[in-house]
Amino acid sequence: MRRIAVMGAAGRMGKTLIEAVQQTSGAGLTAAIDRPDSSLVGADAGELAALGRIGVLLSDDLAKVADEFDVLIDFTHPSVTLKNLAFCRKHGKAMIIGTTGFTVEEKQLLAEAGKDIPIVFAANFSVGVNLSLKLLDMAARVLGDDVDIEIIEAHHRHKVDAPSGTALRMGEVVANALGRDLQEVAVYGREGQTGARDRKTIGFATVRAGDVVGDHTVLFAAEGERLEITHKASSRMTFAKGAVRAALWLDGREPGLYDMQDVLELR
């Protein structure tokens, strides 16, 4: 059995991850961690996820459960994830990282840690989203510079980063396929007298409202026709199941920084 720890276990995504682990053959939740000031520390992780008691108590310190897991799943905040990354690197623990909002420099730290431990880092662990990335690469290469490209994403009102990590990853895939640098061609929102659109740019539009789990559309607009590639998530479980799948896939892997394209053999 693959022994899995969940960081941020008392949060919305954390509870979904607990449920996904418990539903997956070959995986077992052996540790659950949340922030030290959480009033839920000491509670049964199964009860937090409405599964009933499973005998795993919520801890407030990763070090306290260091001997109880093989791989840590972390969907939290960059500052928290980087601290956990240093711990896992020191103690030889594999990691699944679904945290978004990293800077370029922080992503380099993930790559450095990948020299010592196996890591799967992805902006989105959904199988559908990762298939969409493959389709986006194909579409961008075929349509080339003959279309305007816009990325529209929507999430729930509690999401703290914008654009979403998934939207940015979609932009990176499209830009790479076209031989462009996303940092140079991205346009984040428009207002006022913007002038005519530069076809070389890739636009981003963000919606934050209600309880939207995650919608992403990439629009390729030409004269007389347009192509839209859309993915809509209706439950966080799709991300959680993908993360657990990645955790099982990492078993026995050499150190390295992998992503879901590797897990799904889409390369």
From Swiss-Prot:
It is an enzyme of class 1 (oxidoreductase). The active site is at 155 (proton donor/acceptor), 159 (proton donor). NAD(+) binds at residues 8-13, 34, 98-100, 122-125. GO terms for cellular component: cytosol. NADP(+) binds at residue 35. Pathway: Amino-acid biosynthesis; L-lysine biosynthesis via DAP pathway; (S)-tetrahydrodipicolinate from L-aspartate: step 4/4. It catalyses: (S)-2,3,4,5-tetrahydrodipicolinate + NAD(+) + H2O = (2S,4S)-4-hydroxy-2,3,4,5-tetrahydrodipicolinate + NADH + H(+); (S)-2,3,4,5-tetrahydrodipicolinate + NADP(+) + H2O = (2S,4S)-4-hydroxy-2,3,4,5-tetrahydrodipicolinate + NADPH + H(+). The keyword Cytoplasm applies. It comes from the Bacteria. SUPFAM superfamilies: Glyceraldehyde-3-phosphate dehydrogenase-like, C-terminal domain (SSF55347), NAD(P)-binding Rossmann-fold domains (SSF51735). GO terms for molecular function: 4-hydroxy-tetrahydrodipicolinate reductase; NAD binding; NADP binding; oxidoreductase activity, acting on CH or CH2 groups, NAD or NADP as acceptor. Catalyzes the conversion of 4-hydroxy-tetrahydrodipicolinate (HTPA) to tetrahydrodipicolinate. Belongs to the DapB family. This is 4-hydroxy-tetrahydrodipicolinate reductase.
